[in-house]
Amino acid sequence: MKSRREQDYYLGLDIGTESVGYAVTDENYNILKFNGKNMWGSRLFDEAQTAAERRTFRSGRRRLQRRAWRIQLLQELFSEEISKVDQSFFVKMKESPLILTDKTNGQKYTLFNDDDYSDIDYYSEFPTIYHLRKALLVEDRKFDVRLLYLAVHHIVKHRGHFLFQGSVNNATSFHSVFDNLKICLRDEFEIELECHSEEKIAEILKDKKKSKRDKCNEIFNELNTDKSNKQIKSIVTLISGMKAKVADIFADESLLEIDKPSISFSESSYETLRVELEDVLGERCGVIDIIKCVYDWAILADILADGEINGKSYLSVAKVNLYDKHKEDLRILKQLFKGNHKVYKEFFVDEGKSNYCAYVGFVNSNGSKKNIKRCNREDFIKNLKNQLGKIEKTVSNQSEYEFIEQEIQADTILPVQISKDNGVIPYQVQGMELKDILAKAEKYMPFLSVKDSDGVSVSDKIVKIFEFRVPYYVGPLNGYNNTNSWMVRKSDGKITPWNFDNKVDKDASAEKFIRKMTNKCTYLVGEDVLPKHALLYEEFNVLNELNNIKIGANKLDADLKKDIINNLFKKKKKVTGKNLREYLKCEGLINDDEEITGFDINFKSSMSSYLDFKKILGDKIDNYSVKMMVEQIILWITVYGDEISILKRVIRKQYDDNQISNEEIKKISRLKYQGWGRLSRKFLGEIEGADKETGEIRTIIG
């Protein structure tokens, strides 16, 4: 007989994400004791976190470090000239956030402390930085080098987004964003978006006098589409700034159950919602981004609408006009409110949650400005409407009251310099202004035209600093921490935006990036995973879905799955359940009464990359050698991203004109693929085994 210490027992575990519960029992499930205490309990701990949060902080830290690096390089270019005028200028700028007692120079003013020019004069002449930028553009006089630096510093610090490639005309072109939308809808949903006039749609979107609903209806009428098409209607609704259901946009009823089933680009919370959407939609979120580009174009067109000088639209000119409009709107509003002292004080003077002070972010306290927490525009407008309701009966100037109401209705009242709308400004708009400011300044500041031993002028270096982005496949430029650095150098020395191509071997760095950053196969140790859009990996995902399908109680056989792939997935980017049923009926494999089970309404997988390359290469994509070439090109597209010049170069270096033409390379360079799978080529296509029933030698993918 076993002693009590040797008897059999059960150990039960309840393992969760934040706790582990345990219990020890005998064979009859009675809790056992040890040292007089029941052997059960739990251990609590913090839930494990993925690397995503760390990566977000690291990316943000690097972004700020690179911004500081750009500013440092800019200061080095200006330092000699500025030191001739004010040797402590950069020190004063650095210490500007400090109180007077903490400053090393003990000066009251933060920028200018000359005998004949101080900060008071500066802010009187240039109420905002955009007033200074505009003056440098349009006024024919010599400016202090410090003023030039302040304007250039602002542009270099706030460059704009890099979503569009090419010239400023391409970045601000409606045709460009609308064409991208048409391509996206054709590829993702097989929707041919045709319209009577692109120019008319652009004019509708830009019209400030039209309501969002009117814009939506008029744009929809301009499209050559079925008026009952719910999907197109929801996309147009979104473009117009109204709220649309995600399920309608994707024609996917399963999306009705998500936490936030409706979205609107005009809401201040959209950017937060975008992160949540990506978790649900995955790569399909790219469709939302392309739709938003059309919406963003309308905002950009509105921002630049009043900024035209000599055929060019300048941001600074537009922003100065916004400042003037805000000033005039504020004057009218204060005039309306003056008849009611209490309401006036609550809205314009006191520190509140959604009054004017909260809207602009400061309140006048004891003769000085005090920064306070800002409210969003939606809350401010809501409060403004309420306050106007209180004074409606006491207003003496009815025309001004009606003007304010119209401005509120059009959402153009009291525009501010800093808002979320600034996020739609592409770097090309800022870059054009920077180049024109420098070109004008070169006439009276000769140091800007001085060239170094490589023939690069100071102005050219400033533009290079502004346009420079470290390619993600090059990684950190500081090789101090070798575990997170893989850059390959061509030569030693300090790396700057204007010598980057001479100091860094981008091709070798990209190859090293592939080897370092590519994940490894889930099942085979040391084998690199395939790109998410590799031909083989997409075919595997399609087969994975087909393997679950049943006609009645029977699964599809191998030959039928192959036929479905050849006749449906290799012809359509989006295969639906309806497409499958129609195909099986045409082949005489099912009748109207038989049920198809094992998948959702539509297939989630597709062979999109096969179809992309078939459009470019034709039927030769089915040749084995061409297919292997395509697989390699897909890998390069995934790695190099937007670096089109490198992509073209590596393709041409590897394959000659007989294998792929320059025109084909040009078309291929427009393709965009992102993401990686979890399985390797060796696992899917090279490991062989014998079928137990037939003895046939096969791979995992067949």
Tell what function each PLM region has.
Residues 1-702:
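Extended, Lys/Arg-rich, non-catalytic nucleic-acid recognition/anchoring regions
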